[in-house]
């Protein structure tokens, strides 16, 4: 497995007057430092987890929900999918001293940024996924800003758990292009799953019925199960067998 995609784009945030890290799609970051984690979201979702007792937190940024993930894929590819991105974030916080039962979540994103996206609304799927995942993990969502049509800029302070969101104009340089590429990728994955289902159906077709093999049933004496023992003396089968032996 390749190295996990930990965000490395560090900077100093003049607005919040503290060090910051900018997260790109597929990345995550965990820390106990008093800093700000920043990301821009379209249909993608960012989950921000915080342990108020330990004073640690983290953020991820995933592009698609759990379907389509290849268990054999490298970590850099799997981080695109919500199931893997959430698992990594939770595990890394636990390694740093957090406790799952204390985690609180704030979730953002899942917008329908591309006009006319009706057949595949990636944002809705991502939003539904993160809610279901956290419910199954019994992690409480304390704040959310999901779905809608506007991209978002999210700032999260992992030490305090404070989060802020800013709605952006519809056409943000880089976001629209990324969303179009993501829609094409979702189409490709859906087509691949359809092909796999067709191949699986073809492979499982029942074989053509074979003609029944002729059977000779042997009747034994009283108390003997059908098919067991030798033919009884005096039976037609025994008489025929005796004549063949004499010949």
From Swiss-Prot:
Listed NCBIfam families: PRK13487.1, PRK13489.1
EC top class named in words: hydrolase
Cross-referenced InterPro entries: CheD-like_sf, Chemorcpt_Glu_NH3ase_CheD, Cytotoxic_necrot_fac-like_cat
Catalytic activity from the UniProt record: L-glutaminyl-[protein] + H2O = L-glutamyl-[protein] + NH4(+)
Protein's UniProt name: Probable chemoreceptor glutamine deamidase CheD
Primary role: Probably deamidates glutamine residues to glutamate on methyl-accepting chemotaxis receptors (MCPs), playing an important role in chemotaxis.
Domain of life: Bacteria
Compositional bias of kind Low complexity: 227-239
Family of the protein in this entry: Belongs to the CheD family.
One MF annotation (Gene Ontology) recorded for this entry: protein-glutamine glutaminase activity
A single BP term in Gene Ontology: chemotaxis
Keywords: Chemotaxis, Hydrolase
HAMAP family named among the record's database cross-references: CheD (MF_01440)
Region called Disordered, residue ranges: 204-247
EC nos: 3.5.1.44
A Pfam entry, by short name: CheD
